Regions:
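A structural signal for short, hydrophobic/glycine-enriched beta-strand patches
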Residues: 2-167
Length: 167
């Protein structure tokens, strides 16, 4: 392993096998199957929500569950890529809902949660919402950013141990 010090910091060289092992751990991708719902953790970018809309239209799940509230007291706004869906949203879930609707998902298929401020809360507050609505899931698809997949999967699996979760 070729290690160097750059600007006072030790740098590590990883070989291809090590890089692949890290990649395989961080990035999850299951073979998708039909499910009861699609979990959509909050984000100011539209891409993973556009993918969730495509999965809905392809018949993978009848219910979409976007989750996301405020960060530091307010929704910080959408990314440059997300501005095509509008710019004035009270919370992340409102933005995600707009992305879904503008991509052909009917409002009746969306059940949003507008309080979560981080990934674990996305899962916890979505569970509370489902319990209030007396909705019981057996299988769900977790639709999130690729680099966020392992962390999201771990949190959602912890909060929903009774549900099979596909990423």
């Amino acid at each position: 392993m070729d290690n160097r010090v750059i600007e006072g910091r030790k740098m590590y060289h990883l070989d291809e096998k090590q890089i692949q092992e890290i990649t395989d751990y961080i990035f999850l991708e299951d073979k998708l199957e039909k499910a009861d719902a699609i979990f959509i953790p909050g984000c100011a970018r539209p891409e993973h929500t556009e993918e969730a809309a495509r999965l809905y239209k392809d018949g993978y799940a009848p219910l979409l569950l976007p989750s996301g509230g405020l960060f530091q007291g307010s929704f910080q706004g959408v990314s440059k890529e997300g501005q095509k869906y509008g710019a004035d949203f009270a919370c992340e879930a409102d933005f995600l809902e707009a992305v879904l609707i503008q991509n052909g998902v009917p409002a009746s298929a969306i059940l949003k949660e507008c309080e979560a401020t981080y990934t674990l809360e996305n899962a916890e507050k979505t569970k509370v919402l489902l319990e209030k609505k007396d909705i019981h899931l057996k299988k769900a698809i977790l639709c999130c950013k690729a680099h966020h997949s392992r962390r999201s999967y771990l949190y959602y699996s912890m909060v929903f141990p009774e549900i099979e979760i596909l990423v």
